[in-house]
Amino acid sequence: MKKKAIYPGTFDPFTNGHLDVLERALTIFEEVTVLIAENSNKNTLFTVEERMDAIREITIGMDGLHVEVLHDGLLAEYARDVGANAIIRGVRQVKDFEYEFQLSLLNRHLNPDVTTVFLMPNVKYTYIASSIIKEVAMLGGDVSKFVHPSVLSMLHRKRKELKPNTTS
């Protein structure tokens, strides 16, 4: 049986921390699906299509990697449907772990065949969240150390769309 994992998230935007966790997951699992959540409860900056295109561009050439969208439904059921035996979650701080631990227990209840695997990113990414990256970028700050150049370009374009009288 192939070791297959799902790496779910909003990925708005996909950061170097996300990439770091993904690269670690690919050393453990034969197949990893980056699963973009189309979460109507979150106010996203980028469309699902924009996020999917960005992730595909950043991860081109990575063996065993797939990028999909979860439009609705439960993650545990999706894992069952695609035959995944693990859910990857990046954990930066204790605060993240408490929330993720609760989700892990619920997913295990819904699908006893799936295990949540917690991976810590490189320490240089532990204090950066997508929400902070978006906020700083939309205010004109430099986030180039925390995102891929293509994501940085997307952030600059989005800033110009939303605030047309700004430079950068």
UniProtKB/Swiss-Prot annotation:
The keyword Cytoplasm applies. Coiled coil: none annotated. It comes from the Bacteria. InterPro entries: Cyt_trans-like, PPAT, Rossmann-like_a/b/a_fold. Pathway: Cofactor biosynthesis; coenzyme A biosynthesis; CoA from (R)-pantothenate: step 4/5. GO terms for biological process: coenzyme A biosynthetic process. Substrate binds at residues 10, 42, 75, 89. Its cofactor is Mg(2+). SUPFAM superfamilies: Nucleotidylyl transferase. The record marks 18 as: Transition state stabilizer. It catalyses: (R)-4'-phosphopantetheine + ATP + H(+) = 3'-dephospho-CoA + diphosphate. Disulfide bonds: none annotated. ATP binds at residues 10-11, 18, 90-92, 100, 125-131. GO terms for molecular function: ATP binding; pantetheine-phosphate adenylyltransferase activity. Keywords: ATP-binding, Coenzyme A biosynthesis, Cytoplasm, Magnesium, Nucleotide-binding, Nucleotidyltransferase, Transferase. One of its GO terms (cellular component) is cytoplasm. Reversibly transfers an adenylyl group from ATP to 4'-phosphopantetheine, yielding dephospho-CoA (dPCoA) and pyrophosphate. Homohexamer. Belongs to the bacterial CoaD family. This is Phosphopantetheine adenylyltransferase. It comes from Chlorobium luteolum (strain DSM 273 / BCRC 81028 / 2530). The gene is coaD.
